[in-house]
């Protein structure tokens, strides 16, 4: 027998490894659960544990990817990191015996699983561009240049990071404040539009229709995040009319999401519950009650009343049916309370986790009859897509940015320091066309940088950089351009101590300058 030991938190400890004996390779295998995000195999210290040597004191181990905590719906993953880190571990390690997937749930982000399974057959770093060329053709059964361009944008946004994307729809309403997204949602919407361009060519593919649904689900989530920030703004301003408008738009997002989820059978509440019923039918009534109740409790209360405050909504889903009967209903309750407060200052009834437990439990014990039939037809998918683009678009036209080639283009940064607010920290705020948000790249000593990909080469006439302006702040930085992202030309530098203003610093280029990439490197800040 072989003991499979999970590397998690402070485990395995030094004493545990010693206790496994001198010939551990014969009967012990360590699963490095967070090999992608926080590997332990190449460290001698994690949690409270200090080891004698790396690779778990020279014990055989498996590189693992832990995804989809709680089965929560979110488009995320790190394609380039997977393609790099697994071969790098093979090259460096002496005791790596394979790769593994330790997801808490599946049915989302199929691309990351396709990639990691391909990595089992090579010890070389995968070229993501080439891999995506093959993937699009293999997945959709036909090649589309627009679809391939869409996947470039997906790789630069949702598949450039791990961890659930911020969401508000399935969150406990009382716990939600202003929320920010870790990438530019307009780029995701652009990817979706590109994917739709060859709909007639690709729509016979079930995988293509699934991908459209998954992107639509993420798009409506991103729209709801932005829209709820608008709700907060109106409420805090005491503007009743605007509050009602923004509230209606926010609540409509639940209807659109419910419609989207109804296109995939595995995204139906009726299918989730129905699978438990299918299993339970072979047993007695008590088993039926237990299995179906557990299926419903798992995705709502997670546990019984005694644990109501421990992990509420840990395994939340946004299944069709649940979106309206649970999530929209509880948001309507709170927003109606706030609307009444704006009208006549009626006290707001605040719910705690105990209130929400009982709200959920009523649903668990008296669940409506939900359908198990999804409409995944191309005609219906296209109709849903048009409604989404019509009612939940995040594309904004900002006239004052006419001629701004960099606005909302793909951007990468050396580092992102999230401020926790709705407009600070992430690189996407560096080129969103407004001075109300900003990018934070960390200490200037690290020479933080950002690179904007304009999509194609342009003859650039000038570059304007607006650093954060407040009080006596001033920054120094260098600006470079490149056609290929490899060879860079310095076009200007701010080296003085002039205090920053909202006009920023403009570098005018007199000679013809063709460039696709623009890079800004911070070299000094007078702020500690």
Where do the protein language model's features map onto the residues?
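Catalytic-core regions of glycoside hydrolase
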Residues: 1-144, 155, 160, 173-176, ...
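Trp- and acidic/polar-enriched beta-sheet ligand-binding modules for extracellular glycan
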Residues: 414, 442-448, 469-528
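Mature N-terminal, pre-catalytic/accessory segment of carbohydrate-active enzymes
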Residues: 209-408
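Disordered, acidic Ser/Thr/Pro-rich linker "stalks" and the adjacent N-terminal cap
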Residues: 397-457, 468-473, 493-502
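C-terminal functional modules
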Residues: 165-203
């Amino acid at each position: 027998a072989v003991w499979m030991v999970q590397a998690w938190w402070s485990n395995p400890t030094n004493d545990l490894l010693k206790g496994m004996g001198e010939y551990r390779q014969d009967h012990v295998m360590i699963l490095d659960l967070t090999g992608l995000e926080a590997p332990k195999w190449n460290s001698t210290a994690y949690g409270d544990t200090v080891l004698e040597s790396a690779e778990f004191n020279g014990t055989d181990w498996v590189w693992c990817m832990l995804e989809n905590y709680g089965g929560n719906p979110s488009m995320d993953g790190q394609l380039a990191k997977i393609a790099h880190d697994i071969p790098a571990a093979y090259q460096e390690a002496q005791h790596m015996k394979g790769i593994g997937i330790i997801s808490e749930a599946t049915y989302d982000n199929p691309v990351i699983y396709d990639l990691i399974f391909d990595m089992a057959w090579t010890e070389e770093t995968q070229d993501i561009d080439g891999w995506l060329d093959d993937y699009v053709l293999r997945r959709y059964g036909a090649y589309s240049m627009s679809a391939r361009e869409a996947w470039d944008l997906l790789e630069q946004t949702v598949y450039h990071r791990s961890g659930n994307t911020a969401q508000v729809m399935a969150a406990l309403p009382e716990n939600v404040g202003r929320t920010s997204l870790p990438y530019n949602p307009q780029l995701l919407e652009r990817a979706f539009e590109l994917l739709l361009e060859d709909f007639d060519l690709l729509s016979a593919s079930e995988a293509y229709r699934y991908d459209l649904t998954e992107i639509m689900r993420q798009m409506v989530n991103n729209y709801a995040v932005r829209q709820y920030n608008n709700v907060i703004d109106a409420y805090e301003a005491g503007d009743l009319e605007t509050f009602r408008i923004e509230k209606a738009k926010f609540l409509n997002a639940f209807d659109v999401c419910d419609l989207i989820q109804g296109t995939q059978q595995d995204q139906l509440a009726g299918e989730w519950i129905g699978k438990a019923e299918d299993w339970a039918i072979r047993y007695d009534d008590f088993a039926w009650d237990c299995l179906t109740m557990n299926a419903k409790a798992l995705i709502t209360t997670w546990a019984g009343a005694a644990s109501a405050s421990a992990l509420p909504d840990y395994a939340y889903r946004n299944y069709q049916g649940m979106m309206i009967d649970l999530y929209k209903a509880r948001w309507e309750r709170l927003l109606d309370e706030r609307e009444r407060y704006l009208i006549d200052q009626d006290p707001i009834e605040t719910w705690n986790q105990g209130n929400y437990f009982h709200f959920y439990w009523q649903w668990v014990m008296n669940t409506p009859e939900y359908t198990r039939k999804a409409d995944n037809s191309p005609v219906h998918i296209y109709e849903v897509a048009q409604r989404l683009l019509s009612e939940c678009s995040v594309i904004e036209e900002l006239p004052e940015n006419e001629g701004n080639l960099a606005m909302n283009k793909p951007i990468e940064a050396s580092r992102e320091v999230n401020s926790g607010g709705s407009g600070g920290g992430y690189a996407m705020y560096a080129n969103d066309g407004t001075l109300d948000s900003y990018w934070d790249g960390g200490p200037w000593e690290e020479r933080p940088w950002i690179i904007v990909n304009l999509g194609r080469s342009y003859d650039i006439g000038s570059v304007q950089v607006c650093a954060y302006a407040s009080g006596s702040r001033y920054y120094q930085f260098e600006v470079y351009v490149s056609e290929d992202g490899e060879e860079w030309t310095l076009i200007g530098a701010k080296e003085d101590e002039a205090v920053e203003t909202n006009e920023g610093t403009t570098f005018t280029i007199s000679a013809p300058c063709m460039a696709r990439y623009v890079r800004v490197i911070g070299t000094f800040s007078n702020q500690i």
